[in-house]
Curated annotation (Swiss-Prot):
It is found in: Cytoplasm. One of its GO terms (cellular component) is cytoplasm. It comes from the Bacteria. Disulfide bonds: none annotated. Its main location: cytoplasm. This is Phosphate-specific transport system accessory protein PhoU homolog. Homodimer. It holds the Pfam family PhoU. Keywords: Cytoplasm, Phosphate transport, Transport. Plays a role in the regulation of phosphate uptake. It comes from Rhizobium meliloti (strain 1021). Belongs to the PhoU family.
Amino acid sequence: MSHAHIMSAFDEELKYLTRRISEMGGLAEQMVADSVRALVNSDLALAQKVISDDTILDDAERQIGEKAIVTIAKRQPMASDLREIMGSIRIAADLERVGDLGKNTAKRVIAVAGSGIPRKLARGLEHLAELALVQLKEVLDVYASRSPEKANSIRERDEEIDAIYTSLFRELLTYMMEDPRNITPCTHLLFCAKNIERIGDHATNIAETIYYMATGAQPQGERPKDDMTSTLGSVTD
């Protein structure tokens, strides 16, 4: 087999990984958007669709991982090519987790459907989701361009989502203190808000991976963070 043919086959394998990552990203975005829409509108059918779609994302991550391992074994890539493949594995894992967070939000739709969500809280959740989805979309666009400058710019904006999450966290605590009947639905909403905030963290993870893929170095400095909920109590995934 000629060297040119081998390189052509290797290029196709890299293109496969890039294409599948893009497909995963599109589905993850849709799942998050649908999960929040289902939550705000008490749409049980849409919530169930999100839950079902998660298996597609899980399968895609597994297929990307398997393809990456086979490609490394066959081609023994070095330097930027190896970073490209390893980066694909890391990004696929982050996108799979984004899908899990969307699914977890969708699962809570049933729990809060009967009580309804105050419009002010619904707007807060929608705004938080909009910011997280913009960050996710932008980082997927940067994945296509492999721009380290743009990747670093996205990484430095993570604190905006944290600040909105902290504000929403406080509002939910206030609702719970005002009326004990709000405790159960607001607890579910706290978990949903944390799910959405974590999506921003995964977008930042992807930005850091892209930076590494493009430069071979890790981004310098600590991530900017503005999550102040630790002073009020904490909510975990």
